[in-house]
Amino acid sequence: NVTGVQTCALPISIPTTVPGLDVCELMPQHAKLAHQYNVVRSVCHTFADHGGGHKRMMTGRIPATPVDTVNDAPCTGSIVAKVREGIDRGIPNYISMNPGGRVNDVFAQGPAYLGQAYLPFNVEGDPTTPRFNVPNIAPTGTSAERVDDRMKLLSGLDRIERQMDGAGVMSSIDKYQQRAVSMLLSDRAKKAFDLSLEPETVRDRYGRHCWGQRALMARRLVEAGVSFVSVVMENPYQSNVPWLKQGVYNWDSHAVNCHIWDDLQVRLPIYDQAVMALIDDVYQRGLDKKTLILVTGEFGRTPRVENSIGTQTGVKQPGRDHWPQAMSMIYAGGGMQTGQVIGSTNSKGEHPADRPLTPNDVWATVYRHLGIDYTMAFPDRRGRPMPILPFGEPIPECLRA
């Protein structure tokens, strides 16, 4: 009963189905299904600010500025959308699901010099609420013939503007139009976003909360042919999860923001249910060879707990600060051999002791899975060729077996 959570004892570790791998007791599904994923323990970088950490993790490039949230290099999803822009399945190749009210660059999901045509198609809000709606995926009172007529008229009207355009703006607009019309004339997107088509038992398995239903929608989108789906699990305190006074909106678990152990009593079971339901479902439905799942944040948290006065509670409470020197993440699916632990840290969890890896290695692995040459380059705004990854190699254990 999340409404009754108070200051609790420290959580303990429990064994998993992988010998030698323990996880927090608040994540029983991670323990039960550990044989279906790999844990990478030794990823590290040097950007401790949220903005710099997001950009470093999501682009595979060293950000020009260590703070703020505007990408100076394209995120991986935008690269995938660029490479696969010729593939039209009536649904975008890059989709992001997030709480809403934020711009894409808050989560370092911007396209930078690739242009606005490679922004993700945003799905905002809480899919569990009755008012949840994905706009612009089906015509409203407009037949396919009328949509076609209007596009022909628009083509004539913008011819002069196109001749005057020297910055490629019209090209980006064209791609938006093509994507929008393709979605309007196909019911693929409408069906993929419609969670009511799922059995109630499946929706229950993912959890009747925003994280669970976003994870379920991600699986449906991949089945519909979307190449890259990003699910932002930021605020669990939405529908069916009452706000906890000593909790925090996101994972920023400084002591001034939250009582970390109380917050995790709510947060981790929701995360555990949503992520493991997705991974297990992907295997049960035979999608594990073509679908690669990556679970990560922008950096780790300090190995040592700090204590400060909480701004919401007014009392001293425990928390953890930013720590990019070492972090763990999960890979699943992708046809890889699972049940592995890759890399290690020193005994205090401070820095890698074995197999130090970077975000570049993380994304080189993803690009390899997608069949994308991770050494390719695209021109920046000055026309200079910019490699999508200036360095890095795929993690062998996380490639197709």
Q: Where are the regions that the model predicts?
A:
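Ligand-binding pockets and gating/stacking loops
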Residues: 5-401
